[in-house]
Amino acid sequence: VIGGDECNINEHPFLVALYYSTFFCGMTLINQEWVLTAAHESEKFPKEKYFIFCPNNKDIMLIRLDKPVSNSEHIAPLSLPSSPPSVGSVCRKPALYTKVFDYLLWIQSIIAGNTATCP
């Protein structure tokens, strides 16, 4: 992050850095098999590796990992919200903004192996 502060290695165990020859993009681990990132990164991925949520320029994408990761001191998924953040509250979760809650049912459906349509 440009202008950001250095953090402890255990401080954000849900952050994922994707390297494709060089640093490619940041993501959020949401369970042992899935990461959440911005859909505008999709043009750089093999098509079978990701799902783009909505054709209406929704900038959200899920990527299924080749194999599940194991939780450890340095690796743990971010807990997805069970209710939307209140207006004006600070989420304090990198890459998890208020709008992500709008897509929570879609995210849960894809992870469960089902399909869902745009809200």
From Swiss-Prot:
Gene Ontology CC annotations of this record: extracellular region; secretory granule
SUPFAM superfamilies under this entry? Trypsin-like serine proteases
- Keywords assigned by UniProt, alphabetized: Blood coagulation cascade activating toxin, Disulfide bond, Fibrinogenolytic toxin, Glycoprotein, Hemostasis impairing toxin, Hydrolase, Platelet aggregation activating toxin, Protease, Secreted, Serine protease, Sialic acid, Toxin
PTM summary? Contains both N-linked carbohydrates and sialic acid.
Q: In this record, what's one Pfam family?
A: Trypsin
What residues sit in the active site?
Answer: H40, D59
| TM helices/strands, residue ranges | none
For this chain, the annotated S-S bridges are C54-C118
Q: What's known about how it's activated or inhibited?
A: Strongly inhibited by PMSF and slightly inhibited by EDTA and soybean trypsin inhibitor.
Q: Record's InterPro entries? A: BRCT_dom, Peptidase_S1_PA, Peptidase_S1_PA_chymotrypsin, Trypsin_dom
Q: Where does it live in the cell? A: Secreted
- Which GO BP terms sit in this record? proteolysis
Please describe the relationship between pH and activity.
Optimum pH is 8.0.
Is Electron transport one of the keywords? no
Protein EC: 3.4.21.-
Q: What is the purpose of this protein?
A: Thrombin-like snake venom serine protease, with high clotting activity in vitro. Also has fibrinogenolytic ability, showing a fast degradation of fibrinogen Aalpha chain (FGA), a slow degradation of Bbeta chain (FGB) and no degradation of gamma chain. Also causes platelet aggregation in platelet rich plasma (PRP) and washed platelet suspension.
Q: What is the similarity comment for this entry? A: Belongs to the peptidase S1 family. Snake venom subfamily.
The entry's protein name is Thrombin-like enzyme TLBan
Q: Which organism is it from?
A: Bothrocophias andianus
